[in-house]
Amino acid sequence: MINVKEYSGHIRNWSALCERLGIDHSLSREDREEQILIKAYETWGNEMADHMHGMFAFALWDDEKQELFCLRDQFGTKPFYYYETADGELLYGTTIRQIMEQPGFVKELNEEMLQLYLSLTYVAGEMTFFKGVKKLLPGRYL
């Protein structure tokens, strides 16, 4: 069984995906998009982003494989962050605050990122202002 653990966004080609994946159009937007994520993952696996258009970031848990699959849209419109604790546990969320509120997070300033930002006034790549917290890059999965 696959569960949506985290989701932020909107799938623009939802109607075509509902047709292709056999999902009821009359479901609420929230239920419909959850079903799209689950069925798209079951159908296309890691390649599901190739079939989806919109702005989204999400995490799916596959009970059978005991795997977490996280994906961010191709343009990076919706953010997705992750952090590995000292115990090797993966914390994740669509906001850094979600990660900060979880046990095991160590709040520490990323001085290297701060120096880059003050020099360039731009936050590039996967680094954030918190040490160990990374952004999932646009169009990438984890």
Question: Over which residues does each language-model region extend?
Answer:
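Cysteine-centered catalytic environments shared across enzyme families
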Residues: M1-Y141
